A protein has these predicted regions:
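Catalytic phosphate/metal-binding cores of nucleic-acid and nucleotide-processing enzymes, i.e., regions
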Residues: 1-110
Length: 110
């Protein structure tokens, strides 16, 4: 299962095989939170998350990264989970990747 988090860019224009599996496009922090609750259950794990930083109003990609690495949701990630940021905002992109990488080191899932 892959997540594309971006309010404007269509994942089909950026990810060659988008839509082949259980791919989910979240356009806001609120949508991402809702999609986690609906689609990630039981033994399902997140395969990859593509983060944008600026999501319009009501949260950022960094908020999404903070949510998925929180004690309530970190179970949805495993040692096969990966992430990237396609944000054009260098500050936001670095903050997201740094947080996700720090989570990986802290949880020893390297």
């Amino acid at each position: 299962m892959r997540f594309w988090i971006d309010d404007l860019r269509n994942p089909k224009e950026y990810v060659q095989d988008w839509g082949m599996d259980d791919d989910i496009w979240s356009r806001s922090f609120e949508e991402f939170m809702m999609h986690l609750q609906i689609h990630v259950q039981g033994d399902q794990r997140i395969g990859h998350i593509y983060f944008d930083y600026n999501l319009g109003t009501g949260g950022t990609g960094l908020d999404c990264a903070m949510l998925v690495t929180s004690k309530d949701w970190e179970w949805a990630l495993d040692d096969h989970s990966s992430w990237s940021s396609h944000s054009s905002d260098p500050y936001g992109r670095a903050k997201i990747v740094d947080l996700m990488d720090a989570w990986r080191v802290q949880t020893n899932t390297v």
